[in-house]
Amino acid sequence: MPQLQYPECYLAPNRCLVSNCGVNKMSNEELVGQNHGMEGEACTGEDVTFSDVAIDFSHEEWGWLNSAQRDLYKDVMVQNYENLVSVAGLSVTKPHVITLLEDGKEPWMMEKKLSKGLIPDWESRWENKELSTKKDIYDEDSPQTVIIEKVVKQSYEFSNSKMNLEYTEKLEGKHGSQVDHFRPAILTSRESPIADSVYKYNIFRSTFHSKSTLSEPQKISAEGNSYKYDILKKNLPKKSVIKNEKVNGGKKLLNSNKSGAAFSQGKSLALPQTCNREKIYTCSECGKAFGKQSILNRHWRIHTGEKPYECRECGKTFSHGSSLTRHLISHSGEKPYKCIECGKAFSHVSSLTNHQSTHTGEKPYECMNCGKSFSRVSHLIEHLRIHTQEKLYECRICGKAFIHRSSLIHHQKIHTGEKPYECRECGKAFCCSSHLTRHQRIHTMEKQYECNKCLKVFSSLSFLVQHQSIHTEEKPFECQKCRKSFNQLESLNMHLRNHIRLKPYECSICGKAFSHRSSLLQHHRIHTGEKPYECIKCGKTFSCSSNLTVHQRIHTGEKPYKCNECGKAFSKGSNLTAHQRVHNGEKPNSVVSVEKPLDHMNHYTCEKSYRRETI
């Protein structure tokens, strides 16, 4: 293992923490301005423990990181542990968090605060040895920048010298500055934009002023204080590429100064290479490659459907422990993240971030095929699958494939019959929370989506889009069998089942089969007698919402179906269809039934035909 050399400013007064560093005696005036007059001492591996170099995240901070940043964190933690073992030997006990990371599990990280203590004056000296930097595309207060700085900074400190000093325990003597419980910024609501520019991860220029405290945890720099790192500058690709590559394969996260070139004020610094791991572990299902076997094992759960983490409240299972942790918040009802614009609260910071884009309206990611814009690059990636018709997620029970993994999870609940979301008003259960939210609007009569043509309001956006096709009469989806057109692709797919006679949904009571699941649910209410839809005007109840909608037109007088020939309007589409036969001269019931002749035939024997058969 090559010997590491360090600048003098890394060495604390009174002690030399690096073996054979070549510095036998140092000037006290140069380091701290005080006359202690002590020789440097060689240290052992016991001077540094894993807790000195461990990187702790709170639950909120961990939830903010994307997959690439989490992979970077895991690599740094393992690298720190390996460096510690190489220095201290096999006597080091493997920490529990390392075991979790090697097994591909999510770490349970708790917040870690530094105790009040003394800060060495050599940190202020380090401030004078600034490196030239370029303007960063990120604000230095950016939450994501802070988190990544935190990971790489601690790895850098340990890789340099196994001397990650704790201000209260590692230094002797008295110094002027103190820090009160410094910890990284609590992530709030901002997701940093990512562009084709240089990210600069500023590392290790800690500057504190006398008797200053970081009293605002939401900010990484306060008035008179700064926490900046200026050693490492890293070029990263676009955010969409980060999802597939943790770092550019052939480049080092920390530049190694093997040639002994001058560092800072004439001192050399050699840094070990980290995060230069090849992706040799390939998934046999989808071909995605990973740098570690443990990460591949965790990814494999997507294909196998393995979910080892179970919620004790509702029995729902998850593939990762972090997902279970986020889910538990839904049971507690806690919503600590509040939007400052409208006051709406959320249980997860990611949900707040997504919500705030509705206020700003910013959508920087545009689809090159159709021009549609999105606020997040992940939404753009999902949207592109619509154009490519790529369906990666397949149901192992019925073989149906889906573009999105969330759609597969939703679909699988049809087979399991799982309905964990129950309405408190009527007790009806649903398989997903969005269906429950939409159902609850029946009780609250909340209708927030308004048609700009007829001013009719709807409880969901999908209903509004479906309604607007009445005004436009646009039906781009045509059946190749009968040339019937539809305004939605889903309606066409449902219609095609009529031609192939596919009826996969069978009633468990009478055995009758149906082409659509919705038809089965509606039929099942005949056996149960359930009529959940009630008219608020007269109290009449109905088994399906469409019948209630048609009935309400009696009270409102609405007649949306208008004849183009004579202008007559009708409340039902079927009535309009029957009326149009008058203009077309159609008489479909001219054929007389042998078993039950028409009542009119009992008195007349003429050849006149009738549009309707009366029995």
From Swiss-Prot:
Numbered residues of crosslink Glycyl lysine isopeptide (Lys-Gly) (interchain with G-Cter in SUMO2): 153, 170
UniProt GO MF annotations: DNA-binding transcription factor activity, RNA polymerase II-specific; RNA polymerase II cis-regulatory region sequence-specific DNA binding; zinc ion binding
Q: Which UniProt keywords apply?
A: DNA-binding, Isopeptide bond, Metal-binding, Nucleus, Repeat, Transcription, Transcription regulation, Ubl conjugation, Zinc, Zinc-finger
Q: Using the record's annotation, list all stretches that form the KRAB domain.
A: 48-120
Lineage, top-rank taxon, reads Eukaryota
Family indicated by similarity: Belongs to the krueppel C2H2-type zinc-finger protein family.
Q: What is this protein called?
A: Zinc finger protein 181
What organism does the UniProt record list as the source? Answer: Pongo abelii
